[in-house]
Amino acid sequence: MRKLALLPILALAACSPKAEAPAQATVAVTDAWCRPAVAGALSGACYLTLTAASDDRLTTVESPAAGHVEIHTMDMPGGVMRMRQLADGVELTKGEAAELKPGGRHLMLIGPKGELALGGKVPLTLRFEKAPAVTLDAEVKAPPAPAHAGASEHQH
């Protein structure tokens, strides 16, 4: 008899709406590329654009193509180039593109394990505070020419 009394409760539980798991935060990665580097180079550089679906942070990057990868920034205080590691990674604001580009934030491949040849691919795994990791192949290509470069201008 007690089993029959539980039957309506079980039936109601089976009909109740199930709670859906919240959608996982995501980060879109576009325009990923790396500069060429000769075999034996001490470092290489990669660039990309990140757009997060919610506030997040790029925390670390890994690549089998290098001993390790660091997130760096570069600036020119007083006309002297200074590069430093961003130990806290890169803050990502929901819906805003965060560019890692020449002359600014970038990924530094420390101890590339071989030549980064034009047309080659560099596998990268990006890890975030909230979003799942993103693995991609960045193409090795020549950097774009500066917008101000011209045939008659001197480059110092």
Where are these regions (language model features)?
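Positively charged n-region of N-terminal signal peptides that target proteins for export
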Residues: M1-L4
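Residue-level signal for mature regions of secreted extracellular proteins and peptides
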Residues: P8-I9
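Bacterial signal peptide processing site
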Residues: C15-A19
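Compact, glycine-rich, soluble single-domain proteins
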Residues: P22-H156
